[in-house]
């Protein structure tokens, strides 16, 4: 049971910052031709045409628990109906064969060539063991790769936000504008893929015992378009041959199915679906990890996923949710508009299911919240709708689900009615209470920690809001790629965050923050939270 602490008076204030109706990056980005001048950029550039054309890179994903590992890859569609296979084991000369399933890739996404996607699950993994594997592509086995499992009683994860390969489009590199065209002409994807690779290499050099990566979404940039060269660049990072990534569906991933082809997520549910897929969950070490597709605004379905996951893994010491949109962030472009659109609905659901930590992305800035829980009041429900052609969302207006009212997020100057409605929307989102705890180590808190990750590739950065919200404990924007390191045991959950300097060094940007559990029963006690939640708050 989470210990309830005395909470001091919280003065709620409306956030009245008006964001532009078209979200735009700043002039800041990570120029790989500069940061990589002495570390491989010339080779990456020389090989870019081949990289962009190779859609068959393998991706690794955590399995349903830490004894499993999931694989996914494309293979060219041929005359044979070979069953997808991964050969895996501790003896290179005697690998066990694991078979899986295959399906057709929508050829609108791949152009002239037809591909199949292949999904295989390997089972029986043990901690601290060296394995080897090969993958069959069109009947040919790939070179042998090494995969090492780490400790599970003390697990270490990298947490990253928005690699968004291709998002540097429009920036200037060596006098030329980076483009987001198809194939090798996508020079933005070339730039961002190199920086993504550099971030992973830097993080792993400092933390070679990482178990896996958690990505808070937007692996790639193009929205609702063919973008295989962006996935090819993302998956070309050398580290990913031996490093699973638990990805989240971001708004740039959401609108076509290639995400679901490239990533073989465990415990896929029918909840929270968009074209890219839906919610999923997995267990690792002492933690239950729940990944929600919050591009789908049906919170009742997300609640179903959380409850299903908790029922499947009731003994997990930690419950961690990953979402893309930052319902408690501090970035200028999203945190007080589309980022917080589900705040009033998700806050009580997270409280009621004893979630410990929520990992977010979307705003390309860094922030760490104070310990937060719901205020127990009834609030409105909000969402966005797809535009007429279904290729993106109408970001200019939030919809009040109960009344149907459209709320302009950037009212015209002098439109007092729209400004009043926007102010009311912001006021309604003051639906939280700040827990009265101090310091960077908290024990048995009632509240939840909300983290927002900056971009791991530096493909795009946003400004921070001019005024720091009262729920934010720390935040930064230094225009550098960043990552966090999570260390999780049975009784502690710690997070450290670093930026990567232009000379490739990892530099801390926040103090270590730790949540401790005292050894008392940490299973969900939903009575109090349920009493404060209205009957329809999760619909």
Where are these regions (language model features)?
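Sec-dependent N-terminal signal peptides of Gram-positive bacterial secreted proteins and lipoproteins
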Residues: 2-23
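Divalent metal-dependent phosphoesterase catalytic cores across multiple superfamilies
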Residues: 28-248, 254-275, 300-311, 337-353
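Ser/Thr/Gly/Pro-rich low-complexity, disordered linker/stalk segments of secreted
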Residues: 32-35, 522-539
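Extended active-site neighborhood of metal-dependent phosphoesterases/phosphodiesterases
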Residues: 116-122, 130-151, 172, 178-186, ...
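Active-site neighborhood of phospho(di)ester-bond hydrolases with catalytic His/Asp-centered motifs
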Residues: 159-161, 212-218, 245-251, 292-293, ...
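Active-site environment of divalent metal-dependent phosphoester hydrolases
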Residues: 165-169, 220-224, 251-257, 298-300, ...
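Short acidic, glycine-rich surface-loop motifs adjacent to enzyme active sites
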Residues: 217-220, 313-333
